[in-house]
């Protein structure tokens, strides 16, 4: 019997779950120094940039029916793609640990039973999500996401329309607009190496990809607003204290736990999918469970309070990688390079993009550093390919 494809609705639901997360709310709190107006502009611009990149990446996988790391083989070759598969698994293990740590820390701030207890509870729930499986998550996710959305709306109302707010924050110059844009791009960018793992199974590739990106972007913007609003109007940056200050007890706890589970499930699941790209002997589901266990143990053992450098490392690796894929697939329309071991030209172009990203980290631009890096990398990729084609014709 032919495997059932995922609907536009279920794809949208998956990415709704990705957007409703502690990571988005916590990142939103960083925007408070800009003041409300400039912070919102940076959030919107960053998500526009990140959303367009997500759509391009998701469409490649949706049209080719390939996972994210399988699409990487198309541009970098069978062996060349292993570098990105390994790096992707490592970043997903990192994200799994960070999300479980953040969720456990925040949950313990509401109900003091020990961070390690909450880490185990969250890890166990993620394993349940993995066992249920992507195509069978429809009803379970619908219930969980509807509840989370209602609770998020209540939290939004309390923060923005409640009484006893702190004095509004004005721009104090501690965060530049360009740096804020980069913080807004950071979350969509972190999903770039993952989105095709879900769009590849879509019944309607274009509609499912568009729905995934739009739903994620809108929900992520909303979550950023909650974090930013909490920091500006309540003067609080700690998620547990935000919940308590706004009058949430068990309700806040449910938001914390289930948003962490639904988001971290995507990280663990995609780590399993990427592991198959490294070795076909690996089973997706069991690899995802192993990643969840490792992430849970790491969340118990290691403190993970500052992830700025981790985000920049993700950007420097995957922004130029996706840029090369976009140039290859949409502009040059090159033949699939999967049969070759290495696609050396593209690997060199990626390295140029990687170095450029690290350099741009020290330059303040109005649009952050991801967009300039990707635009330049795309241009370099096209120029190199045109030169190579001209030389070959002679």
Where are these regions (language model features)?
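Membrane-interface "cap" regions at the ends of multi-pass membrane proteins
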Residues: 1-38, 136, 176-181, 200-207, ...
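Hydrophobic transmembrane alpha-helices that form the core helical bundles
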Residues: 81-113, 261-277
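Transmembrane alpha-helical segments of multi-pass small-molecule transport proteins
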Residues: 14-18, 84-89, 110-132, 146-156, ...
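Extracellular loop-to-transmembrane helix junctions
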Residues: 29-58, 80-82, 372, 376
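Juxtamembrane transmembrane-helix boundary signature
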Residues: 44-76, 83-89, 385-390
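Membrane-interface loop-to-helix entry segments
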Residues: 117-122, 126-159, 171-172, 209-216, ...
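C-terminal membrane-solvent junction of multi-pass transporters and transport-like membrane proteins
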Residues: 172, 323-394
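Membrane-water interface regions at transmembrane-helix termini and the short interhelical loops
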Residues: 29-33, 59, 98, 102-110, ...
